[in-house]
Amino acid sequence: MNTKIRFINLLGVIATSIAMNLAVADTVGLPAPDENSAGAFKSQKHFSPYAGRNFATDVYWGDTHLHTGMSFDAGSFGARLLPRDAYRFARGEEVTSSTGLQVKLSKPLDFLVVADHSDNMGWFPELFDGNPEMLANPKVKRWYDMVNEGGQTAVAAAIEIIEAFSQGTFPMETASMPGTTTYSSAWKTAIDAAEEFNAPGVFTAFIGYEWTSNAGGDNLHRVVVYRDGGEKASVMEPYTTLEPVGSPNPRDLWKWMQSYQDKTGGRMLAIAHNGNLSNGIMFPVRDSFTNKKFDRDYAVTRMKWEPLYEVTQIKGDGETHPLLSPNDEFADYETWDQGNLDLSKPKKDEMLKYEYARSALQIGLQLEKELGVNPYKFGMIGSTDSHTGLATAE
């Protein structure tokens, strides 16, 4: 047996030697390789698949949609972590969660956008601290006592506070709105945290916020991401949805973004998400605010500001729906299709094609034929939309 194995090995050595000699013979008479004699060699296919590549191939992992206790809804349900905590966790540090647990990622993220809601940003930290001006309002004082009692009483307070804000019964004299001391402080906290933890080449801490349009309960939310540092981001406070200082119309958000760029020379983009909760108005062919057909200007403007779409996150997957893709066995993945965001209106089948990314791409091609521009040409990403201050998806 050993003799047979040795014989086989010997044949392998002989075959290798012959191949090498043939390769050498093939180059006999050719000049020594140098830059000046490159043309003297026979043209041949690159032996390296990486030769000639001049595009980026690195993949970076992160989250472009995270809420902390600065967000009105996150704070109402007990989130105590703030932007500094969020960036520390994303960079791989161990932090204490709002429930008192020690938490740490198995591997640090490469980037993070803390995207707290622009409406009423920073209100809850002030409530938790017992801001005397806020507690002078009887309703707010009652909420403060309920929150401090804890348990189901605190949960009831959270629901009551959110409903009051959405239904217009919130004591707005206590609200945190652009121009108020509370709001300015909250925005400065967000900017300072991003500046502190941004480390070029190691970790990117993006400045951002979420513009939370929810007219009639229909979701048109966008995460606004700055491509700038704190010096420019601090020039204008975030845009909100409450009139007269804000608006729920995406066109007005885009005007605000243009104003920011004109004023600062900076750059930004918006990332829409959760069309599945829009009840047919995320990717429409008519303006849901005017009921007029879109024109070329709309298509150009939307394409300019919204090159990405957040296709999946905690509130359901937004790529497609079983009724839109009946032959796709994965179309029912994480489907959330009962109604709009606050379930004030039920879902109808005819709404679906205007809610999901795949059908939106088809609609965009149709609009391009009519308008000459495709408003729904976008890349797709996934984010968490976590409201705990912790970007925990891995």
Where are these regions (language model features)?
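Extended, charged catalytic domains and RNA/DNA-binding interfaces, predominantly
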Residues: 26-394
